[in-house]
Each structure stands twice: as structure tokens, then as C-alpha cells.
Amino acid sequence: MNMKALKQQVGFTLIELMIVIMIVAILAAIAIPSYRQFVVRNAESQVQARMQELDIELNRWRASALTYKGFTPKKVASNGDVSYVYDATDNKTIYVPKGSDSTNFHYKITLVDATTGSTLAPASTGYSTAGSSWRMFAEPNSNYSTAHKIILNSAGLRCKTKNNDSSITVASTNCGTYSEEW
């Protein structure tokens, strides 16, 4: 009996390994962009929900104070403590998701008086504001290049536009030519 005939092949051939590598590469090429889109959509959903929460808080404030002047957003810490404060010293900025700051945010919401463009914060801060209307502008972190810029105001405007439209700012009264409602 021939000893070579009894030996069985052990391991994989080069062609089998190349086929497995190609399959993994194809799956990665499909999965990674889909995951990135999911992350961006999730961040957009979070900021839209936070903007709607702020809208409700603003309307409650106005119902009791008869003006938006003096409004500060509710902030809930991870341990459940509640405070009323903006996330930045300019008294206009709110970072999303909750608990994030200027180094790790997904979206930055700027909340201003629609008439003056200044903060709605209490007058003791030295800012001047009319308090009759407000405007929110959410801008994505630079890591989310495909995300939308989002606008919500007290007049009922709800729109979003692609992030690469640099003409859309907190002072904008609409979302531009290629906008959509949300």
C-alpha cells in the first residue's frame, strides 16, 4: 500500500481562503455604510426629539410667564438630578445627546430669541431679548457630514436641509432650496 495515498489533505486551499476573504469584503462594503446611515438617522431622531421637548418646555414657560424671556432648559443628569441650565456659557447652546459636551456631541442646538438673536436666558445675565418668539437651529458634529441641519421656530417652521449648505444658520427663516419638512 502506498503511504501517500492514505494521507488526507489537511487545511484550506488558497482558492478557498480567497473566496472567504471576498465574501467578508463584500459584506463589509454593504454593512459599514448602512451602519453609518443608521448612526446619522439615530442622531437626527435624538435631536428632533430634544427640540420637541424644548418646544414643550418653552410653551409651558410662556403659559406661566407670558413671554419666552427668562427661559432656561431643563437638564437631567445621569444620576437623575434635575437642573435648569444651558450647556455652554453663551446661554444659547444645548448639546445632544444628553450628557454630552463640546467635545463629544452629535448635534449642537442653538436656541435664541427670533427677534434679537440673543439668548432667552434671564435678564440678570445682561442680555437683551424681546421674548415674543424663538428659533432653534441644530447643527451636526463635523463627523456627521451626511446629517441634516434642522430648524424649528415658534411660528411652526420645521425643516431640515443637508449639512453642506453653508447658507443655513441660526438666523435663517427657512431651510433653503433643497429642504424638507420633518
Predicted regions and their residues:
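Periplasmic/extracellular, small/polar-rich flexible segments of pilin-like filament-forming proteins
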Residues: 64-182
